[in-house]
Protein backbone atom coordinates (compact mmCIF):
# COMPACT_ATOMS: atom_id res chain seq x y z
CA UNK A 1 0.00 0.00 0.00
CA UNK A 2 1.29 3.43 -0.96
CA UNK A 3 1.47 6.15 1.70
CA UNK A 4 0.83 9.72 0.57
CA UNK A 5 1.87 12.64 2.73
CA UNK A 6 -0.82 15.31 2.91
CA UNK A 7 0.81 18.60 1.78
CA UNK A 8 4.22 17.41 2.99
CA UNK A 9 3.19 16.57 6.55
CA UNK A 10 4.86 13.51 8.06
CA UNK A 11 4.26 13.69 11.82
CA UNK A 12 1.06 15.70 11.91
CA UNK A 13 -0.06 18.98 10.40
CA UNK A 14 2.28 21.97 10.44
CA UNK A 15 0.11 24.55 8.70
CA UNK A 16 2.84 27.12 8.10
CA UNK A 17 4.93 24.57 6.16
CA UNK A 18 2.20 22.83 4.15
CA UNK A 19 2.73 22.93 0.38
CA UNK A 20 6.16 24.58 0.81
CA UNK A 21 8.52 23.15 -1.83
CA UNK A 22 11.29 22.33 0.69
CA UNK A 23 8.73 20.62 2.97
CA UNK A 24 7.44 18.57 0.03
CA UNK A 25 11.00 17.58 -0.87
CA UNK A 26 11.59 16.46 2.72
CA UNK A 27 8.55 14.16 2.59
CA UNK A 28 9.68 12.74 -0.76
CA UNK A 29 13.17 12.26 0.69
CA UNK A 30 11.61 10.23 3.50
CA UNK A 31 10.08 7.88 0.95
CA UNK A 32 6.54 9.24 0.66
CA UNK A 33 4.42 10.43 -2.21
CA UNK A 34 2.90 13.86 -1.52
CA UNK A 35 -0.54 15.36 -2.20
CA UNK A 36 -0.12 19.04 -3.08
CA UNK A 37 -2.55 21.85 -3.84
CA UNK A 38 -1.96 23.67 -7.14
CA UNK A 39 -3.72 26.56 -8.83
CA UNK A 40 -2.96 28.46 -12.03
CA UNK A 41 -3.19 32.26 -11.90
CA UNK A 42 -2.26 34.42 -14.89
CA UNK A 43 -0.35 31.53 -16.43
CA UNK A 44 1.69 30.88 -13.27
CA UNK A 45 1.51 27.74 -11.12
CA UNK A 46 1.14 28.26 -7.38
CA UNK A 47 1.18 25.89 -4.41
CA UNK A 48 -1.17 26.62 -1.53
CA UNK A 49 -4.37 25.24 -0.05
CA UNK A 50 -6.57 28.27 0.53
CA UNK A 51 -4.53 30.81 -1.41
CA UNK A 52 -1.50 30.95 -3.69
CA UNK A 53 1.63 30.85 -1.52
CA UNK A 54 4.58 29.36 -3.41
CA UNK A 55 5.26 29.98 -7.08
CA UNK A 56 6.54 26.88 -8.91
CA UNK A 57 7.43 26.01 -12.48
CA UNK A 58 6.96 22.85 -14.50
CA UNK A 59 10.72 22.46 -14.08
CA UNK A 60 10.08 21.92 -10.36
CA UNK A 61 7.09 19.56 -10.86
CA UNK A 62 8.57 17.46 -13.67
CA UNK A 63 11.40 15.67 -11.80
CA UNK A 64 9.04 14.93 -8.89
CA UNK A 65 6.02 13.89 -10.93
CA UNK A 66 6.08 10.22 -9.95
CA UNK A 67 5.80 11.23 -6.26
CA UNK A 68 3.25 14.06 -6.54
CA UNK A 69 -0.55 13.81 -6.42
CA UNK A 70 -1.72 17.21 -7.58
CA UNK A 71 -5.02 18.47 -6.22
CA UNK A 72 -6.00 21.03 -8.85
CA UNK A 73 -7.75 23.88 -7.07
CA UNK A 74 -9.19 25.42 -10.25
CA UNK A 75 -10.09 24.42 -13.80
CA UNK A 76 -7.06 26.18 -15.25
CA UNK A 77 -4.76 24.10 -13.02
CA UNK A 78 -6.60 20.91 -14.03
CA UNK A 79 -5.99 21.69 -17.69
CA UNK A 80 -2.36 22.66 -17.07
CA UNK A 81 -1.52 19.64 -14.89
CA UNK A 82 -3.21 16.83 -16.82
CA UNK A 83 0.19 15.28 -17.67
CA UNK A 84 0.83 14.65 -13.97
CA UNK A 85 -0.96 12.49 -11.38
CA UNK A 86 -3.74 14.93 -10.64
CA UNK A 87 -7.37 15.23 -9.62
CA UNK A 88 -9.92 17.89 -8.75
CA UNK A 89 -13.02 17.98 -6.59
CA UNK A 90 -14.93 20.28 -4.29
CA UNK A 91 -17.27 18.23 -2.12
CA UNK A 92 -17.66 15.12 -4.24
CA UNK A 93 -17.77 11.74 -2.48
CA UNK A 94 -15.11 10.51 -4.94
CA UNK A 95 -13.18 11.63 -7.97
CA UNK A 96 -10.97 9.98 -10.57
CA UNK A 97 -7.30 10.83 -10.89
CA UNK A 98 -5.58 11.22 -14.24
CA UNK A 99 -4.03 7.80 -13.59
CA UNK A 100 -7.46 6.16 -13.29
CA UNK A 101 -7.43 5.72 -9.52
CA UNK A 102 -10.50 6.59 -7.45
CA UNK A 103 -9.75 9.24 -4.80
CA UNK A 104 -12.44 8.37 -2.26
CA UNK A 105 -13.79 10.88 0.27
CA UNK A 106 -16.91 9.08 1.43
CA UNK A 107 -15.42 6.31 3.56
CA UNK A 108 -18.79 4.59 3.82
CA UNK A 109 -18.25 3.60 0.18
CA UNK A 110 -16.29 0.37 -0.12
CA UNK A 111 -13.91 0.49 -3.07
CA UNK A 112 -10.80 -1.65 -3.25
CA UNK A 113 -7.69 -0.17 -4.89
CA UNK A 114 -8.78 3.42 -4.16
CA UNK A 115 -6.88 6.28 -2.57
CA UNK A 116 -8.31 7.09 0.83
CA UNK A 117 -7.62 10.39 2.60
CA UNK A 118 -7.39 9.79 6.34
CA UNK A 119 -6.08 13.28 6.92
CA UNK A 120 -6.86 13.79 10.59
CA UNK A 121 -6.97 10.19 11.79
CA UNK A 122 -3.62 8.45 12.17
CA UNK A 123 -5.30 5.18 13.16
CA UNK A 124 -6.70 3.03 10.37
CA UNK A 125 -9.61 0.61 10.57
CA UNK A 126 -10.49 -0.18 6.97
CA UNK A 127 -12.61 -2.95 5.54
CA UNK A 128 -11.33 -2.35 2.02
CA UNK A 129 -7.82 -2.75 0.63
CA UNK A 130 -6.76 0.68 -0.57
CA UNK A 131 -4.19 1.44 -3.22
CA UNK A 132 -2.97 4.32 -1.03
CA UNK A 133 -3.74 6.33 2.06
CA UNK A 134 -3.24 10.10 2.21
CA UNK A 135 -2.53 11.34 5.72
CA UNK A 136 -0.85 13.99 7.86
CA UNK A 137 0.73 11.10 9.81
CA UNK A 138 2.55 8.86 7.32
CA UNK A 139 5.27 7.88 9.81
CA UNK A 140 2.64 5.99 11.86
CA UNK A 141 1.84 3.77 8.89
CA UNK A 142 5.35 2.42 8.29
Residue ranges and their predicted role:
Residues 1-142:
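Phosphate-group recognition and catalysis centered on beta-loop-alpha active-site segments
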Amino acid sequence: MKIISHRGNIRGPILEKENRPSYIDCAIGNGYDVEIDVRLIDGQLWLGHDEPQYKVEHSWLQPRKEYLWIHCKDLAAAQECCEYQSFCHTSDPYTYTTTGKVWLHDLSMKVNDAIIPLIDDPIIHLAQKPYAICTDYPYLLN
